[in-house]
Regions:
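Acidic, low-complexity intrinsically disordered segments
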Residues: 1-243, 251
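Radical SAM [4Fe-4S] cluster-binding motif and immediate context
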Residues: 32, 177, 183-349
Length: 349
């Protein structure tokens, strides 16, 4: 089956002045590479399907380019992934344009926003056939096999006789090692001129990508959607599987990587195993990660630095203890000050 996967972005998000471009027109800033659709592409291809990806962070991939490809190639399924409310209107617009050129193709939404608002999204955007909830790897494999029988696919929201149907939730997948590495080779990233705008420049100016060693966070911050998306669970890949991907990136010429884990700094023994594996593998790439100030074992900072960790990003959220308490951050300013001192000494710079 031919599947198109699209990373939808608000065009204004990447609107940069001329000074923000290289002489060849490449962007000097951009957001993270879309690891979500790259992961789904790898899963589909391993199962024998054909997959084509489009990243609308690339100014060379506007709607009209995608629409023309749909007109020419006639995929059986088009999946759209978008980050938040700012991209949602553009996803709806693109779906309507898709419908204008191909009324038979099946269209699916996925992502955190779509998961947490699935019934409303299906109601407000009747042009979309399916809203996919939760992790997408096994779901999309099931969907391509049951494209004409959506009732058989767990985690799917769809419509029957004009009424929205929420299939039972899909069980949270614990075994993340079963999935292949993201399909980075099939998505053009040569328009990137530097690292993302939301990662400190201390990381690297080398060829850059992202990877994910774990999913979820056990905390319950009131502003965060991650616990709901992951059904309150935290899951991790084995350190051996993470190291295998790290070595794969190095062998393919990457000079920098950023862990997009929701809370990388959990389980000190796991962090230690990853860092020691990176060190033992010899010359390696620069990397960064993020986590909570109260989930860090400070004694591992020197080891992380030795393993070429260039930056650790903390979600401080507020300098007011009262505000932190209202946000249910479950952290104190004293703990923040303590970890900030260690971060400056050992990791950043």
């Amino acid at each position: 089956m031919l599947v198109f996967l699209i990373h939808v972005r608000d065009p204004q998000f990447y609107a940069v002045p001329a000074a923000g471009r290289a002489k060849n027109g490449n962007l000097r800033i951009m957001g993270f590479p879309p690891i979500g659709i790259m992961s789904l592409s790898a899963v589909l291809k391993r199962a024998g399907h054909e997959c084509v990806m489009f990243d609308q962070a690339n100014t060379e991939t506007p709607n009209q380019v995608i629409i023309e490809q749909i007109r020419m190639r006639r995929p059986q399924l088009v999946g759209l992934s978008f980050l938040s409310t700012t991209s949602y209107p553009y996803a709806r617009m693109l779906v309507r344009q898709i419908r204008a050129v191909d009324s038979k193709v099946k269209v699916a939404f996925g992502s955190v926003f779509a998961t947490l608002n699935a019934p409303l999204v299906k109601l407000h955007c009747p042009e979309v056939d399916f809203v996919c909830r939760g992790d997408g790897e096994q779901l999309i494999l099931d969907l391509v096999e049951q494209l004409d029988n959506p009732a058989a696919v767990a985690g799917l929201t769809w419509a029957r006789d004009g009424r929205v149907v929420n299939n039972p939730d899909r069980a949270v997948e614990r075994d993340l090692d079963q999935w292949p590495f993201p399909d980075r080779e099939s998505l053009a990233l040569d328009f990137i001129e530097s690292i993302p705008l939301d990662v400190p420049a201390a990381l690297s100016m080398d060829r850059y990508t992202t990877l994910q060693a774990s999913r979820g966070c056990p905390r319950r911050c009131v502003f965060c959607d991650i616990p709901r998306f992951n059904q309150g669970k935290w899951r991790s890949r084995s350190h051996q599987h993470v190291l295998a991907e790290f070595n794969h990136l190095r062998e393919h010429g990457y000079g920098a990587a950023y862990f997009v884990d929701d809370n990388f700094l959990l389980q000190p023994q796991r962090i230690k195993a990853i860092c020691k594996g990176i060190i033992d593998s010899g010359p390696t790439i620069h990397w960064g990660c993020e986590g909570r100030v109260d989930s860090v074992a400070e004694h591992l900072y020197p080891l992380m630095a030795k393993a070429n960790c260039r930056t650790v990003m903390f979600g401080i959220e507020s300098g007011s203890q009262q505000v932190l308490d209202r946000l249910k951050k479950e952290q104190t300013l004293n703990r923040l000050r303590k970890n900030d001192r260690f971060s400056v000494d050992y990791v950043v710079g």
